[in-house]
UniProtKB/Swiss-Prot annotation:
Coiled coil: none annotated. [4Fe-4S] cluster binds at residues 112, 116, 119. Residues 98-332 form the Radical SAM core domain. The keyword Transmembrane does not apply. It is an enzyme of class 2 (transferase). Reaction proceeds by a ping-pong mechanism involving intermediate methylation of a conserved cysteine residue. It comes from Synechococcus sp. (strain CC9902). Its cofactor is [4Fe-4S] cluster. This is Probable dual-specificity RNA methyltransferase RlmN.
């Protein structure tokens, strides 16, 4: 959006200031106020001449910040924000704190077209993709809400990032160069869109110089048949083709791929499933991240027992697969993996 300043680099803001008839240092001042001070309107940038601020607002230039609609905090301090865009759409983003880090789980679209059966986001379909400033804002909003500098960012909120790759990669550039978050601390999660992984690698090298962020591919099943049952769009992307594209991505970037696997009680969590998964990803420079299912209202999937989770993990480890188990955070506020939607909690009811 040409009149929005958030999301622009220091160099872009310097050039823009010169084009407006001012010195380039004014662009650097704006950059500081956008990313370090987190202003929400041009009128707040007191370092700029008042007359110029008035002129810019008259020309409809704006910062591009979103509006905080609702904030909820879980018992474990995980914080979920409902944010409104200028056109009235809403998205959710989550801040996940530990003693050592603050991870922000951000959305790349309003809703999601992938319709994974175990995920709340896809139940309402896709409204539109988010612009760069709308994605960047989520990190700033969490920073403000939690009064803490984010250390890690994961594109695991609402939407399919590879259906909005231009804005996602520009956001990564902004997070890296403007907010100082290292690429290796950024993860892009995808359920898989045919032919996009090699394109992502090439576009990342063009825009970022190197693709150093982590790619996380959501498998959630050890074979094509079961994957299609859980992920309707998987019918267009055969399992072997997806893994071949992951290998191609690895060859292009030199970066290990992470595979995500949601464990659904007595559906995809048998030891036989673990053995089949190990056969698929074994000998591959990769890592498997296990995620216990987080309940949503519309589905009757079960969260697996801790015994079944541990048995699944042991099978992978015995077969030489690097594996970890993601802790579920924010469950009591519907802020955990797979639970995000465009709503907030009022008492015990979704509104």
């Amino acid at each position: 959006m040409k009149n929005v300043l958030l999301g622009r680099s220091a160099a872009e803001l310097e050039d823009w200031a010169v084009a407006q008839g001012h010195k380039s240092f004014r662009g650097r001042q704006i950059h500081d106020w956008l990313y370090n001070k987190g202003v929400k309107s041009l009128s707040e940038i007191s370092a700029l001449p008042k007359q110029w601020r008035t002129e810019l607002e008259a020309q409809t230039f704006r910062v591009g910040r979103l509006k905080l609609v609702h904030q909820s905090v879980a018992a474990d301090a995980t914080t979920k924000l409902l944010l409104a865009t200028d056109d009235g759409e809403t998205i959710e983003t989550v801040g996940i704190p530990t003693d050592q880090r603050l991870t922000v789980c951000i959305s790349s679209q309003v809703g999601c077209p992938m319709a994974c059966r175990f995920c709340a986001t896809g139940k309402s379909g896709l409204q539109r993709s988010l612009a760069t400033h709308e994605i960047v804002d989520q990190v700033l909003s969490v920073r403000e809400a939690m009064d803490r500098r984010p250390s890690h960012v994961v594109f695991m909120g609402m939407g399919e990032p590879l259906l909005n790759s231009e804005a996602v990669l520009e956001t990564i550039r902004c997070l890296n160069t403007d907010l100082g978050i290292g690429q290796r601390r950024i993860t892009v999660s995808t359920v898989g869109v045919p032919k996009t992984l090699p394109q992502l690698a090439e576009l990342a090298m063009e825009k970022l110089g190197r693709a150093q962020f982590t790619l996380a591919v959501s498998l959630h099943a050890p074979n094509q048949q079961l994957r299609e049952e859980l992920i309707p769009t998987a019918h267009a992307y055969p399992y072997d083709d997806l893994l071949d594209d992951c290998r191609h991505y690895l060859d292009l970037t030199g970066r290990r791929v992470s595979f995500e696997y949601i464990l659904l009680g007595e559906l995809n969590d048998h030891p036989e499933h673990a053995a089949e998964l190990a056969d698929r990803v074994g000998g591959f420079q990769s890592h498997v991240n296990l995620i216990a299912y987080n309940p949503i209202e519309e589905e009757e999937f079960k969260r697996p027992t801790s015994q079944r989770i541990e048995a699944f993990r042991r099978v992978l480890e015995r077969r030489g697969v690097a594996v970890s188990l993601r802790a579920s955070r924010g469950l009591d506020q519907n802020a955990a993996c797979g639970q995000l939607r465009r709503q907030h909690l009022t008492g015990s009811d979704l509104t």
